[in-house]
C-alpha cells in the first residue's frame, strides 16, 4: 500500500505506544505484573478515545488474530487467512466449519457493544448467569471468569477466553470487548489456576498490548489514506462503501451489492487498490477479499 507523503502529518502521531521500559519489566511477582498490565491497559484505554482510530476495524482484526490463536488451542491447522475466508465467503445457511465457528464467535463478541445479549449471540450455549460480574480488580475478575468457565468445561477454551475478555472489558468500563486474553494466553497458560492463572493473565495483557497498540497506529494511518481518496471514487454510494471497509477486517465485493451493482463493487475494490488505499488480501484471481 502506498505511504502518505513524508510532508503529511502522521495521523497516528499522538496515539500511545508501549514503551520499551514497560516491555522490559520482569513481571516475576503478581505486584510487578499488575503494575505493568495496568499501565498497558491505560494506554489501550487512550486509544479507544482517539477519533483517528478505526475502532470497529481494530477490534475486528484483533478478533481474527484471537480466533487463530484459539484454533491453535484446539489443535486446528487453520490460520488467519483460512478463518477470514470462512467468515467472508460463507453464504446464508452455510456451515462455517470448526475454525469458522471460532472466528464467528470472536467476531460477534467484538462487533456490538458488550452486553449479555452480545455474549449470548457469540456463545449461544452459555448458561444463565455465565458472564455475570465478579468481585476484584479487573484482571482478577477476568482470571476468575476464565477459571470458572474451565471448571465447567475444561476443553472449551473459546468460551473461557471470551468470558475472560468480557469480564475485563466490563470491569474497565469499556463499551466493547477487546480480545487481549484471547491473544495473550496460550493453551499451556490455561492449565494454571488460582494465583498462578492471575499472574499469567497479567502477563498476557502486557504481551497482547504492544501488538494491539501498534496495529491501532497502523490502521489509523491506513484509514486516513483511505479517507483521502474518497473524492477520487466515482461510484455512487462510495462514502457508505468506504465506511464499510473501515468497519470490517475484510470485505468481498459481494458485500457491497446492497449499495451498487456487482460490477461496480468489483471496480470499486480494484480502484481502492490502484489508489493505494486498500489491499487485496488473498493473492487469488477469484474469490478476492479486500481490506486495510
Across the structure, where does each feature detected by a protein language model lie?
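Short amphipathic alpha-helical interaction segments
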Residues: 260-273
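N-terminal structured helix/loop subdomain that forms the ligand-binding/catalytic interface
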Residues: 1-145, 176
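Long, low-complexity, charged/polar intrinsically disordered regions in eukaryotic proteins
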Residues: 162-230
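Short acidic (Asp/Glu) and glycine-rich catalytic loops that position anionic groups and cofactors
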Residues: 42-47, 216-224, 247-249
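Short, cationic-aromatic polyanion-contact patches
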Residues: 234, 283-292
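Short amphipathic alpha-helical interface segments
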Residues: 229-257
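A short, conserved structural fragment
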Residues: 273-283
Amino acid at each position: 500500500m502506498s505511504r502518505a507523503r513524508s510532508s503529511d502529518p502522521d495521523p497516528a502521531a499522538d496515539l500511545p505506544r508501549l514503551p520499551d521500559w514497560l516491555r522490559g519489566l520482569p513481571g516475576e511477582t503478581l505486584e510487578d505484573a499488575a503494575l505493568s498490565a495496568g499501565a498497558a491497559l491505560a494506554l489501550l484505554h487512550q486509544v479507544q478515545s482517539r477519533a483517528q482510530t478505526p475502532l470497529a476495524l481494530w477490534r475486528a482484526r484483533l478478533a481474527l488474530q484471537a480466533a487463530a490463536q484459539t484454533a491453535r488451542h484446539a489443535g486446528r491447522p487453520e490460520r488467519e487467512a483460512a478463518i477470514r475466508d470462512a467468515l467472508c465467503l460463507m453464504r446464508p445457511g452455510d456451515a462455517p466449519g470448526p475454525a469458522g465457528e471460532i472466528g464467528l464467535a470472536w467476531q460477534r463478541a467484538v462487533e456490538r457493544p458488550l452486553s449479555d445479549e452480545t455474549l449470548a449471540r457469540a456463545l449461544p450455549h452459555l448458561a444463565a448467569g455465565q458472564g455475570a460480574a465478579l468481585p476484584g480488580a479487573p484482571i482478577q475478575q477476568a482470571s476468575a471468569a476464565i477459571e470458572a468457565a474451565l471448571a465447567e468445561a475444561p476443553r472449551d477454551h473459546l468460551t473461557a477466553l471470551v468470558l475472560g475478555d468480557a469480564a475485563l472489558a466490563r470491569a474497565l468500563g469499556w463499551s466493547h470487548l477487546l480480545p487481549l486474553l484471547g491473544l495473550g494466553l496460550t493453551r499451556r497458560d490455561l492449565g494454571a489456576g488460582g494465583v498462578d492463572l492471575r499472574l499469567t493473565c497479567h502477563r498476557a495483557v502486557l504481551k497482547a498490548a504492544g501488538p494491539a497498540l501498534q496495529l491501532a497506529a497502523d490502521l489509523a494511518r491506513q484509514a486516513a489514506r483511505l479517507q483521502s481518496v474518497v473524492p477520487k471514487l466515482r461510484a455512487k454510494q462510495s462514502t457508505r462503501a468506504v465506511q464499510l471497509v473501515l468497519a470490517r477486517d475484510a470485505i468481498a465485493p459481494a458485500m457491497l451489492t446492497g449499495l451498487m451493482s456487482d460490477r461496480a463493487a468489483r471496480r470499486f475494490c480494484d480502484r481502492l487498490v490502484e489508489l493505494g488505499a486498500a489491499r487485496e488480501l488473498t493473492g487469488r484471481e477469484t474469490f478476492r477479499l479486500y481490506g486495510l
